[in-house]
Amino acid sequence: MVKEGKAMEIKEAFDLSQKAHQNHAKLVSSLRAAYNKTEDKSIFLEEFIHFLKFPLIVYRREPAVERVMDFVAKFVTSFHNSGGENEEEADEENSPVNCLFNFLLQSHGASSMAVRFRVCQLINKLLVNLPENAQIDDDLFDKIHDAMLIRLKDRVPNVRIQAVLALARLQDPSDPDCPVSNAYVHLLENDSNPEVRRAVLTCIAPSAKSLPKIVGRTMDVKEPVRKLAYQVLSEKVHIRALTIAQRVKLLQQGLNDRSAAVKDVIQKKLIQAWLQYSEGDVLDLLHRLDVENSPEVSLSALNALFSVSPVGELVQNCKNLDERKLIPVETLTPENVLYWRALCEHLKSKGDEGEAALENILPEPAVYARYLSSYLQTLPVLSEDQRADMTKIEDLMTKEFIGQQLILTIGCLDTSEEGGRKRLLAVLQEILVMQNTPTSLISSLAELLLFVLKDDDKRIQTVAEIISELREPIVTVDNPKDAAQSRKLQLKLADVKVQLIEAKQALEDSLTNEDYSRASELKEKVKELESLKTQLIKEAEEPEMKEIRVEKNDPETLLKCLIMCNELLKHLSLSKGLGGTLNEICESLILPGITNVHPSVRNMAVLCIGCCALQNKDFARQHLPLLLQILQLDEVKVKNSALNAVFDMLLLFGMDILKSKPTNPDDSQCKAQENADEDISEQEKPGSVDENLTNEEVQEETATVNGILHLFSGFLDSEIAEIRTETAEGLVKLMFSGRLISAKLLSRLILLWYNPVTEEDTKLRHCLGVFFPIFAYSCRSNQECFAEAFLPTLQTLFNAPASSPLADVDVANVAELLVDLTRPSGLNPQNKQSQDYQAAMVHDGLAIKICNEILKDPTAPDVRIYAKALCSLELSRENSTDLLPLLDCAVEDVTDKVCERAIEKVRSQLRSGREEHRVSKETEPQVSKETEDRTNLQENEEGKQKDEANCDENTDTVKEKAARGKATKGRRKGPAAAATRRKASKAEEAEAEMERQEESQCVPVNTRPSRRAKTAALEKTKKNLSKLLNEEAN
């Protein structure tokens, strides 16, 4: 321990600093006292550096060494931390700080990676322990700067990490040309070690130049790097420094990350930090995310916020609602309506507790229905002039977004009460029929209407009525009057006028004659005639109005009707079928929509035809040619829809719908699978089709199948990425479902996956990358399909011209993939017990194909790829009869030494394994005979019943071990094709063949244990029997 008032020696200080519970402050103080008492400071520093060299050569992160490094850094920097004379001394060239830095800078280029690592580590610790206001000589600063920049390029990752940490205080983020910042950016993008990238993320200062690189690390392949990148963004970067696109991208990627740790950082750090930057206002945060263009990302962010808050607190924070539990229409914004919807959906997912809380923020269905209807009625219908004004369009889009969110909130309402449900249905139907309802809202409205209606017949009837009302509304029109009727009315009016004149004249005469009773009667008559005259004049002037239904064929109306029809068909069960109503809709609405000039109408009509085809097989067969024609002629969007419709039909009904006449589904599926993999000439086999079909029908059907597959194959080469991706995805689904088995198409898909043209098509590559291993390892027949595609795929790559993108593909990598996909050891364990797995393995047949390909041209450069693939195969020693002669010929014919050695290794390993198998078969009868003799000897010598029982038990033990050995026969523990093989002559092969034939006659075909297992069992038996015999002798 340190004794007060007494200076310490340097060695003792280094020794004590290694201990875990030592107080480094006291050690520093004592060593400082010894330094101050030393007259010649240079001798002290030399001795100090001498003892420092010992921990510098230790590379492992030993705790004792780490403590020594900390102590050295604290001691040296203590000369900077003190004031007065020591500060002046610290500025001198021979000060401890400068002296140590100079020594470290001289040693940073040492050949020992331990020294380089510790030097960079100590420089880092020195710079970290220096105070904020510390000053370093410019020359020393430049030396440290240059040395650490050199160490950033060190071949050892740990050295680069320490150099990164050491340069953290030397960077200048305000300088766009700062060498440290540029080096950090370079390492962040290009360093292969994830720990180095993490170190850079820890140290780099965010700036206009480095921020995009930090954001880019959120897509790093390593989870710890992605996690740290999000942490840095949440702690060091203000939300305003990020663009809206960057914010949305960060949330979208982070909340959908495969790692739970990354999601946790997004939820608990990044979003919470952004919320603090928005002063706790969730609506302000949503405004910064642009909810109109990214509603799904905003919903995910809201759900992340809701998940860390109790239900009661969420309900209290919902302050935008009035006494009706509604947001006033005049205060509706995209942010508050989305927040309201997200909160309702979150509470509904919380079970009973959430349902109770939901009643506090949502009204009754009838009240909400009136509220929704009143808002949607305010949506304007823009005229042609207004459509040219972007402000008007943006305002309309905002209102449509609000309406969309209000519609989706209906799913959270409690529709169990009959009255509220009926009122809601009535309002939804009224909204769907309204002329000012935007097309963008029709799909959501129809989906919710069908969600409330549970019966399929009621759904069909309701949608049909809405379509009829929307397409044929009641219109009041002028009814032109008949000429004769109009003339009759004029005559009647003239007669009334004459009567009126006569009555007025008689009234005047009566008043003159003072006949007041007569005058009273005439006065009443004049009033009646005046009224009749007025009525006749009105009838003559006003046109007759009539209410009639007028069919509307404008694109907007047709699109609304088709959208509702499509939603209806999607919600119907496949067993429902097409009834009279749907057939009528199809004839009057869907099929005419195919020829419409507007692409959106045609696209929706194609989607409807695809849904109708899934309801009826005959309908699918009838309209398949129409869809195939659309595939080749229409626009990209319509093509995609038609393509998906065709694939859906093939998935549901199989290739049977390609036939002109219905046949047995099982037969049609089998024939379709055969046709998909063979040429027309190979398909014309009498035994592969139904006997009732004529040769002409067979040829027509096979031509149809091959024509469609040729069409799909052509789409795989399409320049349009969407068509290429949809085709590949559809073919993958057909193959995985067993509807289509084709090695040729499988080869095309493999080439498409490797083609550099598809490098940017993430969806396509992800789809194929998931499909290949799942399809290959699901069953043995699929592996056979890959084996059949092996040679065609490689030959296509070998023969690719230099101008083709396939010329840049690594053929060795393709061969390695195909070998790996056909490994028997990778097969699903559930299928390994099946009967077809017990047959000859896929690699045995593939090896024969490869050998034949090598023998075709042994001098070709492609032989190296084949030989390497041959070495990677898992070959069975039991089925090597056909393969060994081919290997012998290949060894003799191949001229390339590398290929010859590779083939020789395969042959040698195969022969040694076969010899082992033969010896084990010969040994088995001998072992059985020896075991039987020993058992008889034991029974003869034993005299007691107990010993006989023990002997029987040991005999049973031997049999059980032998049985277990037989059960394990044939199981392979891993690839054995790469073991060393020795060369053998053809005479030896012939002799081995004769021995094999003799064994097959006298030895049963039953599987046998290996020789080693049998010998071990025999040795155990010998020991047990000897023990028993000794006990008997005693």
UniProtKB/Swiss-Prot annotation:
State the UniProt keywords alphabetically: Cell cycle, Cell division, Chromosome, Cytoplasm, DNA condensation, Mitosis, Nucleus, Phosphoprotein, Repeat
HEAT repeats (start-end): 95-132, 139-176, 178-213, 242-279, 281-317, 439-476, 618-655, 703-740, 785-823, 878-915
Q: Where is the composition biased (Basic residues)?
A: 964-984
**Polar residues: which segments have biased composition?**
663-672
What organism is recorded for this protein? Xenopus laevis
Q: Which SUPFAM superfamilies match?
A: ARM repeat
Q: Does the keyword Nucleus apply?
A: yes
Question: What's the protein called, per UniProt?
Answer: Condensin complex subunit 3
Q: Work out whether the entry's keyword set contains Cell membrane.
A: no
Summarize the protein's role. Answer: Regulatory subunit of the condensin complex, a complex required for conversion of interphase chromatin into mitotic-like condense chromosomes. The condensin complex probably introduces positive supercoils into relaxed DNA in the presence of type I topoisomerases and converts nicked DNA into positive knotted forms in the presence of type II topoisomerase.
